[in-house]
Amino acid sequence: MKKQNKLAIFLVCATFVSCTTPQQNSQWKLTWEENFNDGKLDTTIWSTIPRGGGWAAYLADYPELYQFTDSTIQLMAIKNTNHPEDTARYLTGGIWTRYKKEFKFGRIEVRARLKSANGYWPAIWMCPDPIPYPYGGEIDIMEHLNHDDNVYQTSHSYYTINLQKNDPPKYATAPINKNDYNIYAVEMYPDSLVYYTNGVRSICYPKVNGGKDGQFPFAYDPFHLRIDSQLGGSWVGPIDPEQLPVYMEIDWVRYYEKQ
């Protein structure tokens, strides 16, 4: 019993340290960035996300879903009016770095502007390969629903999804400048994930017990980045086609590592 009490005290103290010690900006060095300045995807880094079930039900690689400006990419969500051979009623765009670029420990930042519509669900998130979901974990840097004035930032795993545990708390909401660009970030450490919106920390998710199948699987495998527009689902609710098209516009993505 005494050993168990000591272990519990140690874990509480470790959690307190990892989630309360501020990280100085001077500790980070920018090691990679994507500015979307070329008017096309850098296919050495990015691929369009293929269609699948659930969240990927409307994803496609049609060019009109990927609109480039001089220095941004817009990932569209539209009604399907031009592709009669495609039975999907709606179409969305999404990109990822899967099998091309991975990230492990460090800070990811994404500067993005979001349009709003009922049933619209843009997301910036990370998953590992080739770990079966949800054992390797899922890092949701940003999810936005409908016309909300806030975003969700969440740590998912077998512990939170299958076991339905929320201790420590797995998510927080953060206010955004709804009609402007916002910067979403996560810092990945061996013992915690720390989320930010516009430089303000929203939540720290600490490691309480280890193991790939445990509460904190995020320290074991590198993650790839996913940025996509999604439509519909039980969480976001029904789609209003009259509010389409909408999009998520990405200005840049940056990756920092400790100096």
Q: Where in the sequence are the language-model features?
A:
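Bacterial Sec-dependent N-terminal signal peptides
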Residues: M1-N25
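GH16 jelly-roll
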Residues: T20-Q259
